[in-house]
Amino acid sequence: MSNNQQNVMLNRLKAALAEQGKTNRWLSEQLGKSENTISRWCANKVQPSITQLNEIASVLDVDVKDLLVSTKS
């Protein structure tokens, strides 16, 4: 991979919540996390850990792969 290519991992948590009619507040209550943390994840400002992604997938009853979008830039 060249120096100007890197893998960027983005989540589609905001879309997954919207598809199920769920809110950031609902997810924060399910996971015991702050709404601010959920908001930052949804905005892709920070990424949840793999463990957290597994917990989110479980709560939303989706495959963890459905929460990720891999792009190259």
Enumerate the predicted regions with their spans:
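The alpha-helix within a helix-turn-helix
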Residues: L17, S28, A57
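Short C-terminal boundary/hinge segments that cap the last helix of small helical domains
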Residues: D61-S73
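A short, Lys/Arg-rich alpha-helix, primarily the initiator
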Residues: M1-K22
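Residue-level detection of the helix-turn-helix DNA-binding "recognition helix"
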Residues: A18, G32, A43-K45, K72
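Short alpha-helical DNA-recognition segment
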Residues: G21-R40
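Short, basic-rich loop-to-helix N-cap that marks the start of a DNA-contacting helix
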Residues: K45-E55
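Residues within the helices of the helix-turn-helix
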Residues: K14, R25, N54
